[in-house]
Amino acid sequence: MAHKKAGGSSRNGRDSESKRLGVKKFGGEAVIPGNIILRQRGTQWHPGANVGIGKDHTIFALTAGNVNFRTKANGRVFVSVAPKAEAAE
């Protein structure tokens, strides 16, 4: 009677789903109000002028314009939106 001993089961084989964090709109890119500029965990980037910050630290545009990243002397990177120049009518 030929028998085969039972094979062991692996305890590996799991991984969490990626959260798609990071910059969505880069420096100089045009945005409209509500556009997500970047997703992050914690404040790796800080909100500057014309941007809002969500409860999950997502930074989003409050006005139409171009995205701007600026590093201050203390090393903090601030994200802001430079408003588009309105056409004089």
Curated annotation (Swiss-Prot):
It comes from the Bacteria. The gene is rpmA. One of its GO terms (molecular function) is structural constituent of ribosome. The keyword Transferase does not apply. GO terms for biological process: translation. This is Large ribosomal subunit protein bL27. InterPro entries: Ribosomal_bL27, Ribosomal_bL27_CS. Keywords: Ribonucleoprotein, Ribosomal protein. Belongs to the bacterial ribosomal protein bL27 family. Residues 1-24 are annotated as: Disordered. GO terms for cellular component: cytosolic large ribosomal subunit.
